[in-house]
Amino acid sequence: MAPYRLDVISLAPQAFAPLPEVGVIGRAFGAKIAELHLHNPRDHAIDRHRKVDDVPYGGGAGMVLKPEPVFAAFESVPVCSRRRVLLMSPQGQPLRQVDLQRWSQDYDQLVFLCGHYEGFDERIRSLADEEVSMGDFVLTGGELPAMTIINGVVRLLPGTVGTPESLVEESHSDLLLEHSHYTRPADFRGMTVPDVLRSGDHGAVALWRQQQREQRTQERRPDLWNRWQQIQNPTPPAP
């Protein structure tokens, strides 16, 4: 199977240097489960000063990323059979676990468009299939959001995580948050491991963990709890 291809268009490609070197994600790159390719729009600038930004039409603060070098960098990227182009933007849809699952399963290539400066020329949006946000805040560029998505997608690819079962019950895999975990010692500074986890009763452990997931979600993320409840108890159609 060909490696999952990740192409990043960024003015700060050096920011991605640690990705292939760290943890299970680094090992996935080393094992050719995924490949990372970096493309700098500055390498495609058309003037001798390699200019990639300019002042905004209509005036205003800051500089705007020019379309020409970004389009040229984008058009230099090889196209795989199942490609998805993601624009990192605070105006995009908030990232969800279901998005990471969809991208890891339905595609074999992701292309990331990372903005900088005050923003990017509006015409750059035409390149994207989706716009993705990390939340209701603004960063200096799209590199950190892109790295977050790369981490989240690569860890879901077959062969990355040694125990695939560990991905099944983790937080957000089915809208519920993950249950609590304990390891030795059984008693630490008066904080003890629940008896059920030491009982050897696998059915009781599974029930306790599910109850923990529901309780945590209800307390910490009522928005997710309400969505989960709606799925479990759908409203019947009106007669």
Curated annotation (Swiss-Prot):
One of its GO terms (molecular function) is tRNA (guanine(37)-N1)-methyltransferase activity. Residues 210-239 are annotated as: Disordered. SUPFAM superfamilies: alpha/beta knot (SSF75217). The keyword rRNA processing does not apply. Residues 211-224 have a biased composition (Basic and acidic residues). Pfam families: tRNA_m1G_MT. InterPro entries: Alpha/beta_knot_MTases, tRNA_m1G_MeTrfase_C_sf, tRNA_m1G_MeTrfase_TrmD, tRNA_m1G_MTases_N, tRNA_MeTrfase_TRMD/TRM10. It is found in: Cytoplasm. Its EC number is 2.1.1.228. The keyword Coiled coil does not apply. Keywords: Cytoplasm, Methyltransferase, S-adenosyl-L-methionine, Transferase, tRNA processing. GO terms for biological process: tRNA N1-guanine methylation. It catalyses: guanosine(37) in tRNA + S-adenosyl-L-methionine = N(1)-methylguanosine(37) in tRNA + S-adenosyl-L-homocysteine + H(+). S-adenosyl-L-methionine binds at residues 115, 134-139. One of its GO terms (cellular component) is cytosol. Belongs to the RNA methyltransferase TrmD family. Specifically methylates guanosine-37 in various tRNAs. Homodimer. This is tRNA (guanine-N(1)-)-methyltransferase. The lineage of its organism: Bacteria, Bacillati, Cyanobacteriota, Cyanophyceae, Synechococcales.
